[in-house]
Amino acid sequence: MAVPIRELDCLDALIWFGTGEAASDKLCISQSSISRTARKVAKIFHLELIKGQGEWTLIGDQTCLNLERHLHQKMRLDCGDPLRLEAQFFYAKSYAQMIQNKHLLGTCNFLDIARPIELLRNHVVDVWIAGYPDLPSPDDPDLTSIYLTRHPLHLAVKRDHPLVQLGDSVTLDDVRQYPCIALKDGAFPETQRYLESLGLWNSQVPVRRFNQEGWMEHAAERPSVSLASVLSIGLYDDPLVFLPIDLGHTTGQTFVVRREHENHPRIQALLTSLKIGSLALAKEHAEVSVGFES
């Protein structure tokens, strides 16, 4: 290996978590040490570490760096170091408790699928808990997806929203009179395609990572409609309620991993643990079903 494991950890943490503060919190290392070490490693691979839009990124050809990351990933798996997991914000809390004591869990605030997929391809993270149906292609040569849970996606609003007053008579035509919170174009392509066909993807939130302040500030501009499931509706500071409308759209948690590591004993042990957690979620919530044989 060209660099020690803990030194590459510092660079990967900056790229993965986005900020020195978040990297410091996760690794329990001072921000100054992380920054100094990350720049040292970037220089070894002839890369430039820069900060743009509030997050750290690398400029240059990362081929050699990713080969080094590949070696470190194999060491991580074989030597028992904590695995690195990222999860879509809407589903992270469901599994966080069983993950955090054994593995390194990301900030779980990405509001797209492109960034987590890139982190998987570049060997920065080992597993991504993604949201169905926005997944890598089934024909993807590097990544494979294993279903955990499935459940309906709902429309949700604040308790004082005018649509709540319509009760069971509310319709999609009623909903279309209000902005429906959407993410940046292409962030969740399959979900976007379906909701656009219903006229329900029309008020973009200008944030790359989830934060309550930015999300709720956008939602407060006009009485808006959000998307939620039984597993995510409790994550917002302002209480939301479901509208009694069947969207006909299914979401759920999916375990995404590199094909080469799918059958590694540690990956299989983690998957088994998450399946047990999924069964508990299905037992707690009638809408949740599991995507595997129990």
Predicted feature locations:
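Secondary-structure junction motif
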Residues: S94-A96, R176-G199
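A late-sequence structural motif
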Residues: I245-A286
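Short helices/loops that flank or line small-molecule/ion binding pockets
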Residues: K26, A114-W128, Q212-P223
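Short beta-strand-centered segments that line the small-molecule binding cleft or hinge
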Residues: R115-V157
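Flexible hinge/capping segments at coil-to-helix
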Residues: L148-L153, V157-C180
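N-terminal hydrophobic or amphipathic helices and topogenic motifs
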Residues: M1-L111, G277-S294
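Short beta-strand->loop
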Residues: D142-L153, V230, D237-G252, H261-E262
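Hydrophobic hinge/microswitch elements
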Residues: G186, L195-V241
